[in-house]
Amino acid sequence: MLVMSITFSFVAVALLVYFYVKVRTSFSPDAYAKTMQQEVIKMIRDIRYEADIAVQMLEKKIGECNQVVRTIDRKLTLLNEEILKEHTARTLFRASGAGQETREEVCARPEHRSAPSRAGSSAAKPTPTKRGTIEVYNEKIIRDNGLRAESPLLKDAIIALSEKGLAPEFIAEKTGKPLGEVQLLINLSR
């Protein structure tokens, strides 16, 4: 029995030493540092993973924004070309004097022979000279059919811009036409 108690004593001392070393290493500053280092490494991995996902999403959004910018740039280029064409056409139209007639030409038409003074204003009437039954005026007038003389070109430009997907408000702003007139032209073209 003595042997057994000595054996148990050695086992107890061995267990005591083992648990002492185990507790001392588990709660030592080195153990805390090692545990913290492992947690920091794990957090760094998580942050890198989340950052990679965020960068991929950001790159995707940047690509979409670049596509939208290219589309807008293409539409603005087309719009500038159309505005330049419309401005050139308007300038040529005004320079050629098209759309203007003298009162002599208007009064020479059969439908205007009976009432030559209808087109004149009451403020300052030019003096007519008689040539048979046609009164000749030297003042120039512009035919007015409800729309301006340049409206066929402008109408085509408005319709083309609306077919390209531009908003009626934007078209009205850029062409100088009222919004209602632009919307009417767009709706009539459909």
From Swiss-Prot:
Bias-annotated ranges (Basic and acidic residues): 103-114
Subcellular location: Membrane
Cleavable signal peptide: none
Membrane topology: Single-pass membrane protein
Keyword Lipid biosynthesis assigned: no
Transmembrane spans: 1-21
Keyword Transmembrane helix: yes
GO cellular component, one term: membrane
Chain positions covered by the region annotation Disordered: 103-130
Keywords for this protein: Membrane, Transmembrane, Transmembrane helix
Family classification: To B.burgdorferi BB0265.
Protein name: Uncharacterized protein TP_0711
Organism this protein belongs to: Treponema pallidum (strain Nichols)
